[in-house]
């Protein structure tokens, strides 16, 4: 089994209306993330020979999501989520990439700080722990 990932980053603001701490207030993060794609075999023909997927293909799916919904947005509005936690953002990105037909989509990880992250896994796959 092979797993590749593509990293991304975005600056955004959000607030968690149900949170009892400081995250209830409007605040921002320098978010980072990774999209993981898995395959039990490598491509054997064409320009992707020897690859799970060309990273540029994954980037082509990911970049519009970042540009049009995440980077420098107020996530409560742009994602249509009442409480855009890192968990919810990871699931939202996963759903959009799945809708776009990204083959082998395994998981999406979103880091809101360098020490705090959430990772959403495909229900079809077992998490790698």
UniProtKB/Swiss-Prot annotation:
InterPro entries assigned: 6-PTP_synth/QueD, 6-PTP_synth/QueD_sf
Function, in words: Catalyzes the conversion of 7,8-dihydroneopterin triphosphate (H2NTP) to 6-carboxy-5,6,7,8-tetrahydropterin (CPH4) and acetaldehyde.
Coiled-coil segments on the chain, per record: none
Keyword Zinc: yes
Entry keyword annotation includes Coiled coil: no
Needed co-factor(s): Zn(2+)
Pathway recorded for this protein: Purine metabolism; 7-cyano-7-deazaguanine biosynthesis
GO MF annotations, alphabetized: 6-carboxytetrahydropterin synthase activity; metal ion binding
Active-site residues from the entry: 23, 72, 112
NCBIfam families: 6PTHBS (TIGR00039), queuosine_QueD (TIGR03367)
GO biological process: queuosine biosynthetic process
Organism the protein comes from: Synechocystis sp. (strain ATCC 27184 / PCC 6803 / Kazusa)
E.C. designation(s): 4.1.2.50
Further information: The active site is at the interface between 2 subunits. The proton acceptor Cys is on one subunit, and the charge relay system is on the other subunit.
Entries under Pfam families matching the protein: PTPS
Reaction(s) the record says it catalyses: 7,8-dihydroneopterin 3'-triphosphate + H2O = 6-carboxy-5,6,7,8-tetrahydropterin + triphosphate + acetaldehyde + 2 H(+)
Entry's family note: Belongs to the PTPS family. QueD subfamily.
Keywords assigned: Lyase, Metal-binding, Queuosine biosynthesis, Zinc
Cofactor note: Binds 1 zinc ion per subunit.
Protein name: 6-carboxy-5,6,7,8-tetrahydropterin synthase
Record-listed Zn(2+) binding positions: 14, 27, 29
Segments crossing the lipid bilayer: none
């Amino acid at each position: 089994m092979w797993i590749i990932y593509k990293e991304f980053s975005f600056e955004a603001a959000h607030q968690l209306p149900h949170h009892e701490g400081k995250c209830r207030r409007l605040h921002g993060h320098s978010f980072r993330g990774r999209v993981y794609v898995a395959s039990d075999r490598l491509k054997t023909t064409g320009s992707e020979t020897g690859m799970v997927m060309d990273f540029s293909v994954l980037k082509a799916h990911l970049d519009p999501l970042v540009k049009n919904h995440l980077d420098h947005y107020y996530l409560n509005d742009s994602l249509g989520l009442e409480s855009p936690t890192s968990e919810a953002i990871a699931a939202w990105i996963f759903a959009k990439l799945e809708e776009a037909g990204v083959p082998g989509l395994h998981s999406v990880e979103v880091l809101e700080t360098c020490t705090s992250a959430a990772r959403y896994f495909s229900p079809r796959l077992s998490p790698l722990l």
